[in-house]
Amino acid sequence: MTLGFMGVFAAVISERVSARAGWWLLGPFLIWGVVSVEVWRRTELAGAGDLRMYALVQFYPMLAIPLILWLFPPRYTASHRVWQMILWYMAAKILEAADVPIHQLFGQQMSGHALKHLAAAMALWMPLCMLAEREPTSK
């Protein structure tokens, strides 16, 4: 999920702010995502479980993307797919937070964690739909 959403964050910057900036930021964003997971893993092994960097990677783009969409006009149609992506991502986070109650609700047959991955897959499907549907906006 982390790598997918960091890539989408760079793509939104590329589409709305600057193509050059989006491409330039893609590598650092992907590295940031990997490092955040590795910091979490290492601190978890040390008994501390520091999720601060991981949380920043998970939530900052989902706060920044709506701001970018609001401040910078679209160059292509089908921007509604980015909003749909954000909604699916929010659903994934809610399902993750409700892991245990969902697991109990489904009689230990399905967990919120598993459903989170389905919602995250839907979220990452939305930019692909956008690319298939979009056309340049008229100025």
PLM region descriptions:
Residues M1-Q109, K116-K139:
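Multi-pass alpha-helical transmembrane bundles in non-GPCR membrane proteins
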